[in-house]
């Protein structure tokens, strides 16, 4: 499509064609079908940046295997609260996706989600003791009842043969397994959702770059848009704007001038993965196996050996190997980081630089790591790995949040944060992990912040779409079991044995 051809006015403008914008658009179409929506994506297709299947690990993050969501306290104890919160969030995502499948809004769920057990795997006494403590903290909870624990290498070999084959039998190892884990192709899901938006009357514009945004005199927002291929420029007015442009969100949020954007900065972290598509190898592994991060490593750098399903083909992914680039998007400019510096965020950014020297040292070490050293890291999880069977691919950028802190000046925040103007006319999402897996609860939070009056009237519809909405499933075992079974049927997933019946 060439430059904006249908409208210069919209009730809602979505900036960015990733999973967040697509999810928000789907919610709005379900809740307010008469509202007009225009989506603008700078690339030629939806879901090509961080939502793309090879730009993220594709883990349906439910805290079943990610050890950084339940770290050990100084006394060795494990607090399960954050893991429970993330799992509750993922249950909402499952319910919304199930509703869309059951309503024939999107196609076969096999195109975007598949059952892949989630495992944690650790080596050595200290890590094994921690994993056992974690298991004992999580197992009594409804949402983790299916979890199994073992230190028996023969049992681990039944779950994931590659991580045991060739390993020293005297080495102490430990593993947990949750059979209900999932692998998600967020690129495919994003394209299903944007397809739904188009078929229901929304205008979806690819190859359109939103270059500026400012308040309109009569209310709402005026957006400047460029069509790079034709060189055309144009404008569109919106009553509400969502800046869901991934790493590109910070620049546009700063351009809006809203007070709520002051003091935020971004710290980009890049990553690489090894990918294997050899059927003789991929057929021997059906799990997402997460380990422990190195000292000083950011949370998104936890090593893991994953089964992936992309375009119906099974493959293996190992990594990530962290790196550093000043780009905020995989396809953007090296000037992104320096151009994001403002008088209001320079102190937080300098404070973060001073207080995170271990992270800086880790990134320098990772960038300097040679190919053979990367293969050796792979062999910690797959002892018999041959480097020639694996290709190195570059993943998407993760822009972590830098924000003001009253005592420290600034802190580096791992996670996501919804930012909305006081009048609710513009909202944005900053940050990363767990990100896409929790797109549904994140966008519900944004709807609540941006449309507080409408939100009260949406409660019944939200409950219809997601029967567990507003309920802590961990405290309602019968409803949790019912919804696990019903969403598994809708999404064609397996049900964890421990929760059946």
From Swiss-Prot:
The family assignment reads:
Belongs to the MQO family.
Against Pfam families, the record matches this protein to: Mqo
Q: Supply the HAMAP family for this chain.
A: MQO
Q: Report the NCBIfam families cross-referenced here.
A: mal_quin_oxido, PRK05257.1-1, PRK05257.1-4, PRK05257.2-1, PRK05257.2-5, PRK05257.3-1, PRK05257.3-2, PRK13339.1
What does the record give as EC number? 1.1.5.4
Which controlled-vocabulary keywords does the entry list? FAD, Flavoprotein, Oxidoreductase, Tricarboxylic acid cycle
Q: Which GO terms describe its biological process?
A: tricarboxylic acid cycle
Taxonomic superkingdom: Bacteria
Q: Does the keyword Iron-sulfur apply?
A: no
Q: Which organism is it from?
A: Paenarthrobacter aurescens (strain TC1)
| Pathway, per record | Carbohydrate metabolism; tricarboxylic acid cycle; oxaloacetate from (S)-malate (quinone route): step 1/1
Reaction(s) this enzyme catalyzes, per UniProt: (S)-malate + a quinone = a quinol + oxaloacetate
Query: So which cofactors does this thing need?
Result: FAD
Record GO terms (molecular function): 2-hydroxyglutarate dehydrogenase activity; L-malate dehydrogenase (quinone) activity
Protein name stated in the entry = Probable malate:quinone oxidoreductase
PANTHER family registered for this protein in UniProt? L-2-HYDROXYGLUTARATE DEHYDROGENASE, MITOCHONDRIAL
Q: Does the keyword Flavoprotein apply?
A: yes
